[in-house]
């Protein structure tokens, strides 16, 4: 069971620690103070994960079991790599037998058992390169992609929703029957066409807000379970 971290100094640092730096802007100082006092950040350091985001995936999996039985996983917007760490572990991926492919336009340090592509997912060559890297049909496509923020809520929402839609189209093109798709989204309304497409192609579509996602954050996750497969869609068109 993925439990919420307990406040304390298990990492050698007490919660409630203040950041003192007169040269730092107040907003930056507040962010850094919140970050170093975040129990999920401390737990990630303690358990060897690259980011607190690991617990978002673990919480979602605890309820919906999307990692169970996964043999190949594609991780979109992977940096710094905590989701890829989990993916490599559950698939048994090794450098000799790669079963996890990760992509991000940001540089990402190497991980055992993960083929990393430093490339914008919107690059036309990205889908083919990901499929070559993962070495077979994926059971799970996970996306933590979000567009760089501009400070304008509506613009940020639309840009991130575009990434969600592109990721969803990719998942439908590459997943094996019964596979799952998980993507980050922002509160503010999921595009109707995206939901309709996912419901047409997957047996279950739900919104998820894990406890490890900060309460003040507008992020949510959209989970599509049980890919129906492309053959059924083809038969429907013929009919």
From Swiss-Prot:
In this chain, the stretch annotated as Disordered covers 1-20
**Mind telling me which GO cellular component terms the entry cites?**
cytoplasm
**InterPro entries named in the record:** RNA_methyltr_RlmE, RNA_MeTrfase_FtsJ_dom, rRNA-MeTfrase_E, SAM-dependent_MTases_sf
> Which SUPFAM superfamilies is this protein grouped with?
S-adenosyl-L-methionine-dependent methyltransferases (SSF53335)
**Where on the tree of life does the source sit, at the highest rank?**
Bacteria
Tagged with keyword Membrane: no
Per UniProt, the keywords (alphabetical) are: Cytoplasm, Methyltransferase, rRNA processing, S-adenosyl-L-methionine, Transferase
Catalysed reaction(s)?
Answer: uridine(2552) in 23S rRNA + S-adenosyl-L-methionine = 2'-O-methyluridine(2552) in 23S rRNA + S-adenosyl-L-homocysteine + H(+)
Protein name, entry field: Ribosomal RNA large subunit methyltransferase E
Q: Which organism is it from?
A: Rhizobium etli (strain CIAT 652)
The root-end lineage is: Bacteria, Pseudomonadati, Pseudomonadota, Alphaproteobacteria, Hyphomicrobiales
What gene name is listed for this protein? rlmE
């Amino acid at each position: 069971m993925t439990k919420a971290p307990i406040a304390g100094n298990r990492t050698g640092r007490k919660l409630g620690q203040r950041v003192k730096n007169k040269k730092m802007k107040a907003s930056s100082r507040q962010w850094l103070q919140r970050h170093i006092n975040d129990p999920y950040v401390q737990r990630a350091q303690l358990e060897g994960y690259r980011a607190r985001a690991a617990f978002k995936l673990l919480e979602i999996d605890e309820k919906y079991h999307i990692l169970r039985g996964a043999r190949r996983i594609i991780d979109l917007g992977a940096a710094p790599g905590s989701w890829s760490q989990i993916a490599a572990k559950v698939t048994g991926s090794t450098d000799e037998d790669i079963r996890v492919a990760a992509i991000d336009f940001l540089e990402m340090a190497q991980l055992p058992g993960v083929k990393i592509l430093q490339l914008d997912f919107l690059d036309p060559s990205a889908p083919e390169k990901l499929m070559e890297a993962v070495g077979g049909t994926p059971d799970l496509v996970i996306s933590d992609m979000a567009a760089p923020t501009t400070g304008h809520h509506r613009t940020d929402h639309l840009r991130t929703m575009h990434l969600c839609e592109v990721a969803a189209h990719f998942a439908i093109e590459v997943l094996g029957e019964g596979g799952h798709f998980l993507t980050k989204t922002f509160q503010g309304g999921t595009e109707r066409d995206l939901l309709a497409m996912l419901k047409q192609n997957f047996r279950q579509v739900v919104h998820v807000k894990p406890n490890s996602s900060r309460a003040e954050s507008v992020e949510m996750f959209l989970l599509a379970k049980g890919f129906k497969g492309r053959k059924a869609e083809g038969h429907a068109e013929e009919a």
